[in-house]
Structure formats: C-alpha cells, structure tokens
Amino acid sequence: MSSNKKPMVLVILDGYGHREEQQDNAILNAKTPVMDRLWQQQPHQLIAASGLDVGLPDGQMGNSEVGHVNLGAGRIVYQDLTRLDKEIKEGDFFANPTLTAAVDKAVQAGKAVHIMGLLSPGGVHSHEDHILAMIELASQRGAKAVYLHAFLDGRDTPPRSAEASLQRFSDAFAKLGTGRIASLIGRYYAMDRDNRWDRVQLAYDLLTQAKGDYVTDNAVGALQAAYERGENDEFVKPTVLQAAGEAKAELHDGDALIFMNFRADRARQIVRSFVNADFDGFPRAKIINFGDFVMLTEYAADIKAPCAYPPASLSNTFGEWLMKHDKTQLRISETEKYAHVTFFFNGGVEEPFTGEDRVLINSPKVATYDLQPEMSAAELTDKLLAAIASGKYDAIICNYPNGDMVGHTGVYDAAVKAVETLDNCIAQVVEAVKAVDGQLLITADHGNAEQMRDPATGQAHTAHTSLPVPLIYIGKPASAVNGGKLSDIAPTMLALMGMEIPQEMTGKPLFIVE
C-alpha cells in the first residue's frame, strides 16, 4: 500500500452554525483567531443544513443524523420525519402491516398496547404527531388498554416545555375514551447512548415493574412537581402515573410495545435491554415475553424485532464509491458522534467498507459536558494528526462533537470554552494537512452553539438551529461556487480528489480549482 497519500480531510465541527448577531453567540464571542483567519483568507461560503435542503420539512432545524446522511450521500435524503408525516397525512400509516399486526394480536389476546417514545414536537428523534397517530391507530383497531410511556425532551425543545405536550395527550386520551399516559421519565435516562446502563435501567424498571421515584395521578402535576425539585424535562426522574383504583400499567407477557422514535442512535440501548436474550448491560429483574415489540424504524441490523419502516437503501455513497475505486479512508470521532461518521455517513450501513478504518475516542464520563467542554478533543486531534501524517489514507472524515454536546447543555461560558478548544485543534489540523500537501474542508452538520439563549422565552437555548453553517477549503488555489448545502460536500470532495462523481449524487462541487 502506498505510504505517501495526500489525504482529502473533512472536519465536521458538530453544532457550529453561523449567526451574525453577537448576543448569546458562543461562536462569535469566543476567541477564534484560527477560524477567523481561515474565513478571511481561504475560499469559503455558507451552506444550508436544515429544512428542505436536507430532506426535512420546511423550516425544521437540522440535526446530526440527518446532516451526516446528507454529507455522505451527496444527494438530498428524505428523512424519516418527512416520510412519516406524509404516511400519516395520506392515511397509509394506519394500514402499516407491522403496526396493525402488533395491535391486532394484542387486542385478540386481551393484552395491552404500550407505546413509548420521546413526547416532543422537536422532530429530531421523534415527533409527538406520530405518537398521537399511533394511539389513534390502536384505538381504531379496538385496543382498550393503550398506555403511553412518555420520555420528556428539553434538549431539542426548550428545557421546560413538556406541559403543552402532556396536556395535549391527556386531552386526546380523554376524547378517545380509552388509554392514558402511564409513566414519565427524562430522555437523559431512557435515551442514553453512551453505555451508561444505570440510567437505562431506571427506564427499564419503570416500564416493566411500574417502579419509579414518584407515583402520582396527573401528568401535568407530576411535571410541575419535577420542576419544583429542580428537574428540567430532560432530567425528570422516573414517575408512575396511577389514579386511585387504577391498575399499574407495567408491561406484561403478551403485551405489544411500540417504540415511536425514528432516530436510531438514542434508541438502541433501551431496545436491546428489552429484546436481546443475551443482554448484560444490567441485571433485568423482570424479562418480558412480548406479543410483539415493534421498532418504528430500523435502529440496528442486529436488533431482532419487527420494523414498521425499514430503511430505504442508498447506493454509491461517498464511502462506497471510494471502496469501488480502491481508495482508503478513515472515520474518526468521539463516542458521542462515532455513529455519525460511520453508520450515518455511510447511509445506514453498519459494517465498514473495504479499505475503511475507524478510530473511536472515548468521550469523557461526566454527567453533562459543560463540566468538561474540551471533551476528548486533545486525544482526538493527536490521533487525527497521526493519521494525516501516516500517508495511509486517501480520505479522512473527522467529527469534533464539542459545539453540539456543550451547546446542548445551555451553559454559555462552557460553550465558549468548547469553541476555543476547537480553534486550537483546527490550527494543528491545518498545519498537518499542509505538511503532507493534502486538502482540508471544514464544515458543520447543523447549528447549535451560535444561539445559547432563546430570545422568545429567555430560557437557555439547548436545541439545534436552522441557520447555515460555514464551509472553508484549504488546499489548492480555488474559487467558491455559492448556494451550497450539505449534500454538495461529497461531490465537492470527489471533485477535489480528481475522481468521477457517481450519477446517484445530485449534489454539485462547491469549489473550482483554478
């Protein structure tokens, strides 16, 4: 293998959006001499990373999964959110064979239909409209015992915003005359993705045993009590909802459980705890023999459970195209974004392509990343620099999670520190790429840290934004072609590498080498 390759390096600064106003802008107010200089001196532009430009509904903020799928595919990929909205609107959702079979089986056996998911209008991991449609589907097909286990958001939505959703669903159940909200828990516990199994166990025990820190008879009241304890939506402790004289709504053998999240990365752990016979993340006090356990979308190829909406396969993504041309590639990130530069960037393909190496750096084990805004950036940079210098790779894809993960905490000073950490890392990466006569693209998958307070509510802004993101090129003399979006990045890299662009990629190169 050649040992003097000049790599095409893509650095994705997660959650690093562009916003002109300084107020509450951790990116603009941070000391970033390196990025400032690159923006002034190198070919650059702003590119779209949200809404219709990435296959989401118009105006919908971008997110990491969607961003990386578009980055790697080189075409606009219509997302699960858009697809499900369309299915519900046109009525096809209510005839989905996997969903209807699970409900019918439970109804015929006199069993309950349990629905779990992130109860949120955020549209990143789920949408509450889909959960409502599922409740309606179950009711239409004769289910009497319909139980909603609500995971609360406060991360892709304002930190204390769940009341409207809980009231909406309390009213919906009352109107249907069947079913109820059975439990509440913050997504911090139910949707962990970093192998913190003690968190997931709390959600598992809540659903399987109706075991919670609190028991009350009213969802909105339970939320208010959580706020009084100092818990925002994301961190609401396990709460059982049970009125006087009502039976507990825990899972029983033969029940159906339908998981209404459509995004995979934060769904996998809790699903494995329910369905994997050899699960060993924590001791399960009670193992459920489900009538059916249904995933809304495919969370991982190795999870053996029915899937209502299997993925549409993407051919000739950036990674696959490199493999077909005998090129070598590296994917590298921390735990928090490792799935994004591998599984999502490869269009939902779990296994590495031939010639694709992967490096995983452990994210620090802290409760929230404002406590360590540097995260593992120093170690990640060291490994990246070594890979660039090695001469082994034609292309390197790297994600720095700091802007997004610290942005999600809503802690402004920590976000500033995260951005300043990134600037120092970028300085080293630029020098390393220049030293081997390589090429470098710096961009982001969506915004976050540029808006740390919500001007409308005055609360911390913990969600993503729908703002554009920067794109900077360092390498050969070149000029920018404006009007770009994330799906233009893969064709841009291929063009800069002197490679043909596959016909499946409808994106356009954004830099013309002079």
From Swiss-Prot:
Its cofactor is Mn(2+). GO terms for molecular function: manganese ion binding; phosphoglycerate mutase activity. The active site is at residue 64. It is an enzyme of class 5 (isomerase). Mn(2+) 2 binds at residues 14, 64, 445-446. Binds 2 manganese ions per subunit. GO terms for biological process: glucose catabolic process; glycolytic process. Substrate binds at residues 125, 155-156, 187, 193, 263-266, 337. NCBIfam families: pgm_bpd_ind, PRK05434.1-5. Catalyzes the interconversion of 2-phosphoglycerate and 3-phosphoglycerate. Monomer. This is 2,3-bisphosphoglycerate-independent phosphoglycerate mutase. It comes from Serratia proteamaculans (strain 568). The lineage of its organism: Bacteria, Pseudomonadati, Pseudomonadota, Gammaproteobacteria, Enterobacterales. The gene is gpmI.
